Design a protein with these regions (language model features):
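A short, Lys/Arg-rich alpha-helix, primarily the initiator
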Residues: 1-16
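DNA major-groove recognition helix of helix-turn-helix/homeodomain DNA-binding modules
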Residues: 48-63
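Residue-level detection of the helix-turn-helix DNA-binding "recognition helix"
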Residues: 15, 29, 40-42, 51, ...
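Short, charged recognition helix plus adjacent turn
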Residues: 1-4, 55, 65-70
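Residue-level signal for the short linker/turn that defines the boundary of a DNA-recognition helix
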Residues: 8, 18-19, 45-48
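Short alpha-helical DNA-recognition segment
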Residues: 18-37
Length: 70
């Protein structure tokens, strides 16, 4: 499920927040290519980063991974 919903949701949340991939990479101390990989479904962030993403964007981890639509 993470591979199908997460990339699109992450990209939309990042754009809605007015952030570039480079901004997200800096925030999470990862490479820009890691963020790009998350957004195309090539790879997945660790659970700790998922939790931090949910806090940053004000959504639940369940929303990020597609278990909930809100």
């Amino acid at each position: 499920m993470l591979k199908t919903c997460f990339p699109e949701r992450l990209k939309q949340l990042r754009r809605d927040a007015g952030m570039l991939q480079a901004d997200l990479a800096e925030h999470f101390k990862v490479s820009k290519s890691a963020v790009s990989g998350w957004e195309v479904g090539r790879n997945q962030p660790c659970y700790d980063i998922l939790i931090d993403m949910s806090i940053l964007f004000g959504v639940s981890v369940d929303y990020l991974i597609g278990r909930r639509n809100y």
